Curated annotation (Swiss-Prot):
Residues 92-107 have a biased composition (Acidic residues). Homodimer. Component of Ran complexes at least composed of WIT1 or WIT2, RANGAP1 or RANGAP2, and WIP1 or WIP2 or WIP3. Interacts with WIP2, WPP1/MAF1, WPP2/MAF2, RANGAP1 and RANGAP2. Component of a ternary complex composed of WPP1, HSP70-1 and WIT1. Interacts with KAKU1. Interacts with WIP1. Residues 118-183, 236-265, 318-461, 500-604 form a coiled coil. Ubiquitous. Residues 1-27, 86-107, 189-208 are annotated as: Disordered. The keyword rRNA processing does not apply. This is WPP domain-interacting tail-anchored protein 1. It is a single-pass membrane protein. The lineage of its organism: Eukaryota, Viridiplantae, Streptophyta, Embryophyta, Tracheophyta. InterPro entries: WIT1/WIT2. Together with WIT2, required for the nuclear envelope docking of RANGAP proteins in root tips. Residues 1-12 have a biased composition (Basic and acidic residues).
Length: 703
């Protein structure tokens, strides 16, 4: 029977180990705190929340154990009458010994069962009392932990409400434990009068039982013969061997249960990790979607700007085409004007050469005329002398005078003819001067026209080289005109008409110079404008290149975003498949565990039935009606094992069967099951799969 007491101790230790919550419960409480507050809590507040969740789980365990102990008290209440009848019979037997030994054995067996159950109830009540004291200390420590955070708002209020609820539930549980303790003390008071031999001593020979360690049942059975002792010892050995086998099986089942719990914990961790991965993938997908929308907006803006720039470029291209056409026209006109200028230059050179030749000819003719005048004067003087001599000789010679008159008349006619020739030459020179003046006027007008055309050409954007060549031509023409003016001034010294024409030519040349300067200024302005236009065109071209590059980058980013979308969609699909497989595996694992637990419970029931049958067969084999049967030992051990197995496996049975059983026995009793917590995980996984599939469908529709 020492093995039985050791078995009781192991069961109580396992029950105490079951008080410690699983790691997943703390994580669930932490996520619940996050969902309630909507923000990340302080680590001390979160640790206090974890303590409260542990306390709530321990409260659930205590309430469940109280329900089981209430069932035990009900059984003890039903057996109390049997115990009282046994006590009364013992007292009567002490006064008058009876001959019915079988009834005495049955009553002694029931009394021993009552004693064992009352001691079990007492030990369990003590354990619950110590556990409630520990939980009270935990609640006080949690209150001390959250007391510095009174100004944190909603988190503190939620934890304060949880603390108040736990204190209220603790008070209710303490009241129930006190009532249970009173009942167990009453039962212990009744069973304290039973001595070690199973006889009633009237309360004088009561032996205290320490922490669930009971006396040996073999010492409590009154054995009278050696055959009975041998049979009992054999039965005890068989029962001990079976009990050892059952303990081995139970330890193996516990090991398998722990392994399954570890597997469930690892699967829960995998599920949590997959949930985090799916959340990260979903957040990345949302970020990619937002980035794609931003890129779409920027691409639309860039496309609008590009359309505006293309419109401006088309306008600028049209303007450029117009300017090019105007440039071509102006080039053609300039070439025509250059041809005209070349012709004018050639004509000016010819005129200058002609004027130089004319001036030289005029100078030579004037010199000849002067020489002729000198000769004429000398001839006149000689003639006058001759006339005087002839007059003197006329007197002398009359015939000679007539001859002299004839010769003098001829000379006079010759002189008059020479004068007329000189006058004709002067008229010709005057006509030539007038022609030069008219040509100068024509040149002035042509220069004005050329200056205007040069200004127009410079406004239209001609090159500096052409303008420099034109200026050189103008300077050459100016020099030629100056030479002509110098020649005309030299001729004007002798003729006022030539002086007036030369002065007019100088005025015209000065006007032309001023106009040329103005034209040069205008040409510089037009060149600056052309430079500005070219710079603006270059800037526009650079902006076009930049925007084209930005467009290409935007298209690349859009392609990358679409590729990321496809990748994330594929990843989400793969994760969804993995999650579905995990959920199916979890469901299959849960069903397998449930089936295994039901099979174990059935095997335990079968073993209990077999034990009962073995006890009955042993009693039949004894064949001696006066001897005591080992049925009491087997029934006590089977009842004890059944109660312990019920306490260990009650948290793993089907929640619906437990609810129906508890309602039929006690009423409406609240129960917490591990399956309910697992069902939450399954629902969360299904919701995550639905959300990811909906997001994938929406993304495909948007694409």
């Amino acid at each position: 029977m020492e093995t039985e007491t050791e078995h009781d101790r192991t069961v109580s230790v396992d029950d105490n180990d079951s008080l410690v919550p699983e790691p997943s419960s703390t994580k669930e409480s932490f996520f619940e705190d996050l969902s309630l507050t909507g923000q990340v809590m302080n680590p001390q507040l979160s640790s206090a929340g974890e303590v409260l969740t542990k306390v709530e789980l321990d409260f659930a365990f205590v309430s469940e154990k109280l329900v089981n102990l209430s069932l035990l008290t009900m059984q003890l209440g039903t057996r109390e009458n049997d115990f009282e009848s046994f006590v009364s019979k013992k007292e009567e037997d002490e006064e008058e010994p009876s001959s019915n030994v079988d009834d005495d054995d049955d009553s002694a067996e029931k009394a021993l069962e009552f004693d064992l159950l009352s001691s079990i109830l007492n030990s369990e009540v003590k354990e619950l009392e110590s556990l409630l004291g520990f939980l009270q200390n935990e609640i006080q420590s949690a209150r001390v932990m959250i007391s510095p955070f009174q100004h944190d708002g909603e988190a503190f209020l939620d934890l304060e409400g949880k603390l108040n609820d736990t204190e209220q539930s603790l008070g209710q549980l303490m009241e129930q434990v006190v009532e249970m303790k009173k009942q167990s003390s009453n039962f212990q008071r009744l069973s304290s009068g039973l001595d070690e031999q199973g006889s009633w001593s009237g309360g004088q020979t009561s032996v205290s039982q320490n922490d669930g360690e009971f006396g040996d049942l073999s010492a409590k059975i009154n054995m009278q013969t050696a055959d009975q002792q041998r049979n009992v010892l054999r039965m005890l050995e068989k029962s001990l061997a079976k009990e050892m086998e059952l303990e081995k099986k139970l330890s193996e089942s516990r090991n398998t249960e722990r392994e399954l719990e570890m597997k469930l914990y690892s699967s829960e961790q995998d599920v949590v990790y997959m949930e985090e991965v799916t959340e990260d993938a979903f957040s990345r997908w949302l970020e990619a979607d937002n980035a794609a929308e931003v890129f779409k907006g920027t691409s639309k803006e860039m496309s609008g700007k590009l359309q505006i720039l293309q419109f401006n470029l088309s306008g600028s291209f049209k303007r450029e085409d117009n300017l090019k056409s105007k440039l071509v026209d102006s080039k053609e006109r300039l070439e025509a004007k250059e041809c005209a200028l070349h012709k004018l230059d050639s004509s000016n050179a010819r005129l200058a050469d002609f004027l130089v030749a004319q001036t030289e000819g005029l100078k030579e003719s004037l010199q000849e005329a002067e020489e002729k005048l000198i000769l004429l004067n000398t001839e006149n003087s000689t003639l006058s002398e001759k006339v005087s001599s002839l007059e003197e000789q006329l007197n002398e010679y009359g015939i000679q005078t007539e001859d002299a008159d004839a010769t003098s008349g001829a000379l006079i006619t010759d002189l008059e003819r020479i004068n007329e020739e000189l006058k004709d030459k002067l008229a010709k020179t005057e006509a030539r001067a007038e022609e030069t003046e008219s040509k100068c006027k024509i040149l002035e007008e042509s220069k004005k026209e050329l200056q205007d055309e040069l200004g127009n050409f410079r406004d239209k954007g001609f090159t500096i080289h052409k303008l420099a060549s034109l200026e050189k031509h103008l300077r050459d023409s100016d020099l030629q005109l100056e030479h002509a003016v110098a020649a005309v001034e030299a001729s004007k010294e002798k003729q006022n008409l030539l002086y007036s024409t030369v002065s007019d030519m100088e005025d015209v040349i000065e006007d032309l110079k001023s106009k040329v300067l103005k034209a040069e200024n205008r040409a510089d302005i037009t060149e600056e404008k052309l430079i500005m236009v070219s710079e603006s065109n270059a800037e526009v071209n650079e902006e076009l290149k930049f925007f084209k590059g930005r467009l290409k980058e935007g298209e690349k980013y859009l392609q990358q975003a679409e590729e990321r979308k496809l990748r994330t969609a594929k990843d989400i699909g793969v994760h969804n498949k993995i999650m579905k497989k995990l959920v199916m595996q979890l469901a299959a694992e849960r069903e397998r565990l449930h089936k295994q637990i039901t099979n174990l419970s059935r095997e335990n029931c079968v073993l209990m039935v077999k034990l009962k049958k073995v006890g009955k067969t042993g009693y039949m084999e004894s064949g001696n009606g006066s001897e005591v049967s080992p049925k009491s030992d087997q029934n006590a051990s089977s009842c004890h094992q059944g109660s312990r197995l019920q306490a260990t496996f009650i948290s793993l049975t089907n929640p619906e069967e437990e609810e129906t059983g508890s309602k039929s026995d006690i009423g409406s009793v609240r129960r917490l099951d591990v399956g309910a917590l697992r069902f939450k995980h399954i629902l969360v996984a299904i919701l995550v799969i639905l959300i990811s599939s909906i997001a994938y469908v929406i993304s495909q529709q948007n694409m």
